[in-house]
């Protein structure tokens, strides 16, 4: 049984109270029934649950609706393909059918939040086992299908693998990719990707922590495997002179576009503190690149 949760807020400022109450009311519209399961969709016209946002969104909403918070993790685990691939998005159609969509990865804000929900929901052993199995299978899938040149960096096959709508650095890459092999006749993909490589790091990093919690003797094994991914990412995609990560195209050529994705690597933990500090110092705090008092709009 899930623990009971709730949120209350009251203040003497009538305008602030009205704003809070309206925000709570608006957010209730994002609770949707996907069959028998209540989930929290992204909102703003986005009626699916996406792997890039909604495991995180579910965790953020746990005090208000624990059931939805858990379902935002469980639906991705329950709809995982037999070969290990996790759906990039899950949609509930008007007739009530649930469609897990495997035509893109669409980011990977999942392992950390799914593990956090284990703590918040009461530390059920079966849930932890289910999460570990899911992550191990997905990691294996990634290395089976996304390192076509064997360079130790995992690849993006389409624009929506990394959720970068209209990104020019993808060239003529397709928006979606439904195959487990690279698209033919594309000029950039398969792209050695800091994002997709970090997906594996996040899986292995979380599996190391799960192993510690379960005491199954594999903590060090997963830690070493995670560190190996981070080392490959640094060796192939990090530029020491420019203090940022840069993806490589299908020919191994560096894609010379400075983008915010190194920040994503910070989130996944796939780059070191030293690398993160250098990126912040050289770019986020650099007034010659943008007006530093304001957040980078793409990052915002």
Model-derived regions, located:
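Short, contiguous, pocket-lining structural segments
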Residues: 188-202, 218-221, 225, 254-257
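Calcium-binding acidic motifs and repeat modules
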Residues: 140-148, 181-182, 186-195, 199, ...
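Extended glycan-interaction surfaces of carbohydrate-active proteins
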Residues: 6, 10-48, 71-101, 148-191, ...
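Aromatic-rich carbohydrate-recognition surfaces in CAZymes
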Residues: 47-73, 77-164, 197
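Well-ordered alpha-helical scaffold segments within catalytic/enzyme domains
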Residues: 2-11, 55-67, 109-127, 198-217, ...
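Compositionally biased regions
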Residues: 61, 179-180, 212, 221, ...
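Short hydrophobic/aromatic segments of transmembrane alpha-helices and their interfaces
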Residues: 39-40, 52, 110, 134, ...
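Extended, well-ordered alpha-helical scaffold segments
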Residues: 15-23, 65-78, 124-143, 203, ...
